Amino acid sequence: MHFLVVYILIHFHAYRGMAALPLFSTLPKITSCCDSYVVINSSTSVSSLISTCLDGEILFQNEGQKFCRPLTDNRTIVYTMQDQVQKPLSVTWMDFNLVISDYGRDVINNLTKSAMLARKNGPRYLQMENGPRYLQMETRISDLFRHECYQDNYYVLDKKLQMFYPTTHSNELLFYPSEATLPSPWQEPPFSSPWPEPTFPSRWYWLLLNYTNY
């Protein structure tokens, strides 16, 4: 069931032209994940210039918190709806059209297909052997995102990654947080994609648990 939800969540949010999500399919694709975006928190004085996210530019949302890119410039804004008395019921999601390249979406699609086949065709003790586990999928997506940043402009990678990670513990994460081992301007970054042995419950598990509750 969880693998099915993974497939539905990623498949519907990762491709353009899906009839079920016409709004997301019209969003422009970020061609570089290392552009010089600026993270603006709602508590800063700068954010008072922008009172809300434009619906067509939302990159990520989780209940009252949204990550959005305004149409007026290339800044990425972390906007928290603090003025609302009651938070709207919403599902945690991220539009992969905006954060993952075509190659990355192909890899994610292959991972979910192999997981679905293992779930459908193999006995339970083989399902975990043949199909990727949640943490492996999460790690793979994180590595793809990290690698694409490195290919473009590695020295702003850490700042760019931080944009996608809410700092509050109440938010489920689709990627690993930035780590001290990430490249810096004075350090040549070797790239590797190790898949650590998964531990449970993973962030994917809590994300799916939250998703299926709606």
Swiss-Prot record:
GO terms of biological process kind: entry receptor-mediated virion attachment to host cell; symbiont entry into host cell
PTM statement from Swiss-Prot or TrEMBL: Glycosylated by host.
Principal place of residence: virion
A Gene Ontology term for the protein's cellular component: host cell endoplasmic reticulum-Golgi intermediate compartment
Residues carrying sugar: 41, 74, 110, 210
Leader peptide range in chain numbering: 1-19
Claim: Amino-acid biosynthesis is one of the keywords in the record: no
Key words, A-Z: Glycoprotein, Host-virus interaction, Late protein, Membrane, Signal, Viral attachment to host cell, Viral attachment to host entry receptor, Virion, Virus entry into host cell
Top-level taxonomic group: Viruses
Compartmental location: Virion membrane; Host endoplasmic reticulum-Golgi intermediate compartment
Signal as UniProt keyword: yes
Summary of subunit composition and partner proteins: Interacts with isoform gQ1. The heterodimer gQ1-gQ2 associates with the glycoprotein complex gH-gL to form a tetrameric complex. The gH/gL/gQ1/gQ2 complex binds to human receptor CD46.
Protein function: Plays a role in virus entry by participating in host receptor binding at the cell surface.
Designated name of the protein: Glycoprotein Q2
Provenance organism: Human herpesvirus 6A (strain Uganda-1102)
